[in-house]
Structure formats: C-alpha cells, structure tokens
Amino acid sequence: MIDKLQAIEDRYVELSQKISDPNIISNVNEWRKYVKEHAAIEDIVLKYREYKKVLEDIEATKELLSSNDEELKEMAEEELSQLEEKKEKLLEEIKILLIPKDPNDEKNVIMEIRAGAGGEEAALFAHDLFRMYSMYAEKKGWKVEIMSSNETDIGGFKEVILNISGKGSYSRLKYESGVHRVQRVPTTEAGGRIHTSTATVAVLPEVEEVDVEINPNDIKVDVFRSGGHGGQSVNTTDSAVRVTHIPTGIVVTCQDERSQIQNRERALKILRAKLYEMALQEQQREIAETRKSQVGTGERSERIRTYNYPQGRVTDHRIGLTLYRLQEVLDGDLDEIIDALILNDQAEKLKNMNLN
C-alpha cells in the first residue's frame, strides 16, 4: 500500500507543476483535466503526508526511550502510545480514501416510489415513503420536485417520481433502492389485524444529455389529455406526454405540468436516467461475473427494510440494524441508517481491494 501511496504523491507533485505551467494554462481543456485529477487525489496525499510525519515522530520518540531520565522516559512512552494510535487511525482513513469513487456520487437523483403488494394500503405506504424522503431532503438542504405522480382517491400514491437535487444526494440515497415492507393495522381494518404491504423504491442518478444519447428515431411520443382522480379531465388541452423507447420497451408518462413541452422534457429526463441505469447494471453484471464476487446484489426483488408500527421498529435487513424509533425515521431522520449502510459498503469494498 505504501508503494501505491508514494506513486500517488509523485503524481500529485507532477500535476502541481503542470497546473502552474503557463503553456498548459493556455490550453483550457488540458488544464481543467489536470486540475480535476489533482483535486481527486489531494485528500489522499495530504493524509499520506500526515501519516509520514507521524512515522518520523514515532522514530524520534523511540530514541528517548533509552534515556536515563525516568520522567522523560515515561513521557516518551505515553507519547509513543498516542502516536501509534494516531498512526493506525490514519491508516484506516487512508484505506477509505483509496476506495474507488462512485462516478455517480456527485449527481442528483431521480427517485421512483411505487406501491407494491397490498392495494390501497401499499399506496398509502408509498405516500409515507415520499414524505419521509422529502423531509430527509429538507434536513439536508436538497431541493425536491415531483416529476410525475399517480395519486389514489384517499391520498396514496400508486407511483410518484421525484427529482432530488443537492450536494451528496445520490451518494446517500442510492442505498434506498429495493423493496420496503410495512407491518401495521390499516385505517380501513375494522378487526384490528396487522397487514403487511410493500412499496418499491428505485434511486437513479440524474444524467445529462451528454451521458446518454437517445436516437430520435428510437422514441415514440404520444400526447393526450391529463386526467385527475378517477380519470376526470383536469386539462382541456393534450398536454400529457407518453414517451416509449422502442428498442427497450421502456414507457414514461408525464402529465403533472400544464405545458406539453415541459412534460416531454421531464419524460425524456426520466428515460435518460432509466437507460443509464440499464447500461450501468449491465456493466456491473459483467464486473461481478469476472471477479466472482459481489458487494450486495442490488436486486430490487430483495426486501431491504421493514417498518413495524406495533413495535415502533425499523429493521434494515442488509446489515441487521434495528432501531426502535420508527416515527423519527418516518419524519426523515435517516442518517443513522444511511451512515451504517455506507460503513458496511466501505468494509465490503475494502475486503475486495488488494492493499498489500
């Protein structure tokens, strides 16, 4: 690992010279490329330099252990213990920094929440999840925009698609993809029996047009009138848009905006995210087959979390984490769960890295 760190530091020094070179500065594209690479490895280099300084301090302190002055010797032993502890802590921090970054972590999010098994109760649970993520986003200072929704008559969601934008949104919310299960007594249940319902959450990175190119010949666009609850007409013009991607069969419908142009733009944005995710999943499948190891399968069919109302309990099945503060979680207090998922993800990735 030390050889790898030294190579990174050497590259950092080289890049520092390049981004100060007037000949390179005059070529904006080349200069930006070097600045980006320089910034990407800066944290590793600074932490490695701190680690090397601690090693020097350890060697200097060890020399004091041979002193005849007992008081000085005792102080040196205490300092050495602290330095060894600091060295181990820095090593762990460096290992985390060496984990390859997810290129999508800086992207915004397109989140799809769909009612699963459980009929109207599942739709109400989908609305609860929508509220939970909206409140979490608010706590984080992220912006939430409903791109498309299909509401039920009693306030649930058959489906709702959100655009969540803000620093770190995808890097934290990506762990929410999967099947969420709720266990509770529905308001419509006269006998007081506990029902189990599900909703699925898909978290996609929002992608730019440059990331995914859509051939205009590959899409079919249909326009129709927006419908309210029970199919009632809420718009007298054909403003709703349905976009079909012919090669994959993906269909996206948007009708929340009054303008056909806005609905079309939103539908294409969602389609781009879906196509990007398909390409990403295919790439990850190939990597998994090659390496014969997987860091979580990410399959949507997996039940990832249970929300148990009678017990006031939330359990994340992927990491065996159980919290008895259901209401706080539903009010958007998700950091404890997400932080634990991130740590677990980092630990799994470190296992698969050769840092010797």
From Swiss-Prot:
Q: Name one GO molecular function term.
A: translation release factor activity, codon specific
Q: Among its keywords, does the record have Cytoplasm?
A: yes
Give all N5-methylglutamine modified positions: 232
Annotated localization: Cytoplasm
| Main localisation | cytoplasm
Keyword Protein biosynthesis on entry = yes
Q: Which Gene3D superfamilies match?
A: 3.30.160.20, 3.30.70.1660, 6.10.140.1950
Q: Which domain of life is it from?
A: Bacteria
Q: Which UniProt keywords apply?
A: Cytoplasm, Methylation, Protein biosynthesis
Pfam families (alphabetical): PCRF, RF-1
Query: What does the entry report about post-translational modification of this chain?
Result: Methylated by PrmC. Methylation increases the termination efficiency of RF1.
**Cellular component GO terms, alphabetically?**
cytoplasm
What role is this protein assigned?
A: Peptide chain release factor 1 directs the termination of translation in response to the peptide chain termination codons UAG and UAA.
Task: Give the protein family.
Answer: Belongs to the prokaryotic/mitochondrial release factor family.
User: What is this protein's name?
Assistant: Peptide chain release factor 1
Species of origin reads Thermoanaerobacter sp. (strain X514)
